[in-house]
Amino acid sequence: MNKRAALRGIGLLSVAVLSSGILVACSEDKPQFNAIDLTGADYAKDFALADPQGRTRTLADFRGKVVAMFFGYTHCPDFCPTTMAELAQVKQSLGAEGKRLQAIFVTVDPERDTAENLKSYVTAFDPEFVALRPENEQQLSALAKDFKVYYKKVEGKSPGSYTM
C-alpha cells in the first residue's frame, strides 16, 4: 500500500470517528439517574446542622431526594469550587430528574465561613444547593467522624492565614 492510500484511509477513519462523536453529542437522551442506597450503613446516618437562615436541618428534610454531601470550605482555591461546579453540571445534565438531586455543602471551616458567605457561595453554583455549618469544632469533629471525613487546619506562611 502506498503512502497516499494510507493517508486517505486514516483521513476517512478520522472523519467517521468524528461524525460518530458529533451524533452522540447531539442526542436528546439524558443520562439515566441511578443512586446507591446506604440505608443499612453504620455511618453517615444523620446530622443536625444550621443552614444560613439559622434553621436546623437534618437528613429527613431531604427525604425523597438523592443527597450528595460535600465537605469543603469557601476559601478553598481549587478542589471545592471545581467539585461544586461538577455537581451543578450533573444536576443540569439530568434535566427534570435533576430536581431529585440535593447537593449539600458542609463547611469544615466554621471559623471563617459565616452564614452569609456560605449562602452566597453555594447559590452561585445552583440556587437549590444547601449550605450547612457546624456550630463549633466539637460538632464538626463528631460529624466528620460519623461521615468518615478527614480534615485538618494547616497554617499558612503569613500570620493568621491557613488552609483546610
Question: Could you say what each language-model-derived stretch is?
Answer:
Residues 82-143:
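Structural microenvironment flanking redox-active thiols in thiol-disulfide oxidoreductases
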